[in-house]
């Protein structure tokens, strides 16, 4: 049994170190330049993994799309001049040579930079943990989220920190800092209770998509349209994080997408009170503060152009 448990832990660690970054690198490259972009993205990501000791989610998000973009530009410049019948030869050799080049540059040039960034973030996070100031991290996290940088923050920064801590402690609070669905739920409840117009009408549908589907992006327009509501998000996030710290709560792995179901699936045995309590507290705090803000400063719907533009980001809304 002990051998199987150790083997399982090593398997999980290897998947976090190799499989997940490679998938990120391939997916990022494929989004830029199809299958060829995905292949060179994965190859270059492997160089980032080999060149560092830390989990390279951030590196994969950078070098995957970056190397695919380089290949796309090279193909655009050279493919028209390839003689007929030599297309396959060009495809294979160009990808291989460019993949070697981007891998060498990543290994020798970018790997030390990525290591320095990871070490800096790790030291910063350790300082927050030791000083008990982890909840304050929610302030920049929420701002980054509503600017649609949530995936970069979660997978590029928090997931590697959480993976390292989880490998040592069996769970980590870092997996919950960005992915907690509680504050977003509270914000949408506030709009449902105290909002008006399309914001009030669309809130129930957005709640289902956000809380159960884990698509946090659905509530970002609600903050961008009324920026003072970021205070409600801070209230919910900081309150939840204080509870997580007080109860020593954590998840065993990343909850992605940030759905309540993903949270439950990653909750360690005996840790449901800490995890679910933080979700509930975050939702209540965000809902109360958000309702007060909407009562004090109601959202204005006078700019039809802005309203039309934002409504396209909210499911089930026709203006």
Regions found by a protein language model. Give the residues of each.
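Single conserved hydrophobic/aromatic residue that forms the stacking wall/gate
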Residues: 1-7, 11
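Hydrophobic core segments of alpha-helical transmembrane domains in multi-pass membrane transport
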Residues: 4, 22-30, 45-48, 64-71, ...
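Structural signature of hydrophobic alpha-helical transmembrane segments
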Residues: 9-18, 56-69, 131, 176-179
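Alpha-helical membrane segments and immediately flanking helix-loop junctions
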Residues: 16, 20, 28-32, 173-243, ...
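Hydrophobic alpha-helical transmembrane segments
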Residues: 40, 58, 62, 135-136, ...
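Membrane-interface helix-loop-helix junctions at boundaries between adjacent transmembrane segments
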Residues: 44-129
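Generic multipass alpha-helical transmembrane bundles of integral membrane proteins
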Residues: 103, 107-212
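Transmembrane alpha-helical segments and their short flanking loops
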Residues: 159-169, 221-318
């Amino acid at each position: 049994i002990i051998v199987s448990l150790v083997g399982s832990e090593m398997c999980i660690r290897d998947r976090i170190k190799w499989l997940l970054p490679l998938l990120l690198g391939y997916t990022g490259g494929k989004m830029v330049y199809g299958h060829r972009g995905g292949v060179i993205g994965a190859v270059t990501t492997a160089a980032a993994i080999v060149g560092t000791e830390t989990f390279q989610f951030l590196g994969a998000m950078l070098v995957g799309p970056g190397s695919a973009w380089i290949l796309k530009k090279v193909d655009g410049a050279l493919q028209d001049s390839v003689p007929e019948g030599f297309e396959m030869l060009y495809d294979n050799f160009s990808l291989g040579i460019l993949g070697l080049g981007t891998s060498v540059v990543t290994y020798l040039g970018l790997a030390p930079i990525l290591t320095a960034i990871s070490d800096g973030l790790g030291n910063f996070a350790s300082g927050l943990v030791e000083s008990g100031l982890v909840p304050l991290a929610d302030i920049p996290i929420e701002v980054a989220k509503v600017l649609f940088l949530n995936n970069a923050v979660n997978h590029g920064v928090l997931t590697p920190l959480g993976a390292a801590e989880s490998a040592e402690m069996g769970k980590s609070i870092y997996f919950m800092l960005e992915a907690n669905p509680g504050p977003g739920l509270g914000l949408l409840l506030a709009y449902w209770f105290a909002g008006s117009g399309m914001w009030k009408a669309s809130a129930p549908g957005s709640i289902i998509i956000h809380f159960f589907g884990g698509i946090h992006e659905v509530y970002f327009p609600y903050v961008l349209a009324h920026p003072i509501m970021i205070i409600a998000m801070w209230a919910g996030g900081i309150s939840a994080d204080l509870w997580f710290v007080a109860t020593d709560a954590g998840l065993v792995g990343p909850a992605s997408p940030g759905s309540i179901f993903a949270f439950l699936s990653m909750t360690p045995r005996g840790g449901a009170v800490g995890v679910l309590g933080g979700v509930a507290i975050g939702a209540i705090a965000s809902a109360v503060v958000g309702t007060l803000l909407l009562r004090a400063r109601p959202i204005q719907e006078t700019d039809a152009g802005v309203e039309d533009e934002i409504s396209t980001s909210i499911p089930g809304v026709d203006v």
